[in-house]
């Protein structure tokens, strides 16, 4: 695992966040990516719905580069997904008329997220996107990277 301000973060760093969601009854699937880079397996989510046939509403999400890859995947799978969660990430793909529910969050003190790019690419999200700026939050705040 590299430090919190670089890519290639182990997927298990996001387990505590997903655990909190799971405690609320939300099925969360944490996918291991080759070399801890979502860009190396852009279709990793393809086989997941068939493993959980009882689930009817599917969201995909990710943090940073993983979020950008999730957005790219969502743009190509709008008929199969219900929503997208972007954590310190933005979408370069046009999702404006996708019908997806989108939630985007980042920290007010995020020194890694390219804010100019984030703002410029907000045009790619549906008008009803929900956005949260976490006061005092930083880029690494979405994961548990260890000491």
Q: Where are the regions a protein language model picked out?
A:
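Short beta-strand/loop motif that positions the catalytic acidic residue
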Residues: 98, 104-106
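Gly/Ala-rich beta-loop-alpha elbow adjacent to hydrolase catalytic centers
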Residues: 61-70
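Short, surface-exposed "cap/lid" segments of acyl-processing enzymes
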Residues: 1-22
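Conserved alpha/beta-hydrolase
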Residues: 18-38
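Active-site-adjacent alpha-helix of alpha/beta-hydrolase-fold enzymes
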Residues: 22, 106-147
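Active-site nucleophile loop of the alpha/beta-hydrolase fold
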Residues: 33-34, 85-93, 107-111, 136-137
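Conserved acidic catalytic loop of the alpha/beta-hydrolase fold
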Residues: 43-58
């Amino acid at each position: 695992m590299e430090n919190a301000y670089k890519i290639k973060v182990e997927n298990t760093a996001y387990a505590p966040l997903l655990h909190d969601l799971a405690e609320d009854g939300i099925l969360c699937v944490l996918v291991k990516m080759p070399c801890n880079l979502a860009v190396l397996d852009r279709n990793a989510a393809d086989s997941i719905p068939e493993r959980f046939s009882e689930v009817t509403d599917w969201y995909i999400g990710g943090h940073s580069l993983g979020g950008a890859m999730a957005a790219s995947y969502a743009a190509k799978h709008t008929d199969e997904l219900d929503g997208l969660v972007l954590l310190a990430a933005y979408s370069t793909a046009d999702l404006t008329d996708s019908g997806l529910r989108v939630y985007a969050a980042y920290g007010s003190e995020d020194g890694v997220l390219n804010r100019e790019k984030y703002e410029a690419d907000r045009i790619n999200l549906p008008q009803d996107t929900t956005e949260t700026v976490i006061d005092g939050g930083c880029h690494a705040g979405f994961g548990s990277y260890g000491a």
